[in-house]
Amino acid sequence: MEFPTRDGGLLNVGVIGLGFMGSTHLKAYARIPEARLAAVCDPKPRRLSGDLSDIQGNIGGPGDKLDFRDVHTYTNAEELVADPAVDAVDICLPTHLHLPVALAAFQAGKHVLVEKPMALTGEQCDEMIVAAKGAGRVLMVAQVVRFWPDYMAARELVCSGSLGRLRSAIFHRKCAAPAWGRWLKDPNKSGGGVFDLLIHDVDFCQQLFGSPSAVTAVGPEDLENGIDWVLAHLEYAHGAPVIVSGGWHHPRSYPFSMDFTIILDGGTLHYHSLIRPLTLYRADGTEEKLKLSEMDAYEAELRYFVECAQADRWPEQCRPEDSAAAVRTALEMNESRRKKETADKRR
């Protein structure tokens, strides 16, 4: 794959971290004419040579071999951040490193896209937002489910009110514990399975319903042995039960999957990544396979970030304030299951 030099009005992007998500973002940027890959950073010389074939992830195949001949390469994030050829920084590092690198980028006047989860605490998220606004730069968190075609179509139907009131909703996301990246099994670096996986569904609920008033969660937590699974009940003002469930609790042979069932007065929306595209089962007994966007979700996400950065516009479709709220809800889920009590904001 090549990254041709393009002229005029481009956003020059530097990608920090060439693991699974960094590699995924590189593929997407190659399809975005308004962006130019200016720099990459990774501690592994092999990856800086363009050989990403050792990369593993829970979706997709191995990494590619890329052409970095016209790209600045760094082993140190601070050096990339200081590169005057870079307009925006895409941070694909372990979660505990997000805040310091983002702060350095804002201090250098760069726009920032940071992978999910935004950070490990609500306070860290707030600090990042304050720094972005103080620098007058764009900050967006890569919550890709907001751009996933099936989730986008479901959101439009739920929020339009055309199917009536919500009766219940359940979201699943599950896989085996990652066999790559030892840091993922360290809760002080990753936050565990709740932060790695369920943050997507928590954020989607944030987009649909706002922040829950109370969270009750149960589930085993044994990160040393690759087990971190949660079933959580999120309470909202609308009163309908919302369940978020999943994590790492399966053998390595078990494939990654995500699914949801949203029941409304006028019908049920159901999606399963392995077996069923988004389908609407109407109350009148008919069913409909819904028309979806054909654009890859990662490409759509990065196109939106590039558009916002070029216009110096806050990303209202994927606000970092919502990402921070999702982090707080994830923390409440962990607090609830550890204390074996409801985390209730109404108290």
Predicted features by range, described:
Residues 114, 139-141, 244, 271:
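Hydrophobic residues in well-ordered beta-strands that form the structural core
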Residues 24, 291-303, 318:
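Active-site loop of classical SDR/Rossmann-like NAD(P)-dependent oxidoreductases
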Residues 1-108, 126, 135, 345:
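N-terminal glycine-/serine-/threonine-rich beta1-alpha1-beta2 phosphate-ribose binding loop
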Residues 1-7, 35, 46, 88-90, ...:
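C-terminal helix-rich "cap/oligomerization" subdomain common to oxidoreductases
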Residues 1-3, 7, 202-276, 302-313:
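Contiguous beta-strand/loop segments that form the cofactor/metal-binding neighborhood of enzyme cores
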Residues 108-121:
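ADP-ribose/adenylate-binding Rossmann-like module
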Residues 138, 145-223, 340:
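Predominantly a Rossmann-like dinucleotide-binding segment in NAD(P)-dependent oxidoreductases
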Residues 118-138:
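Rossmann-fold NAD(P)-binding glycine/threonine-rich loop
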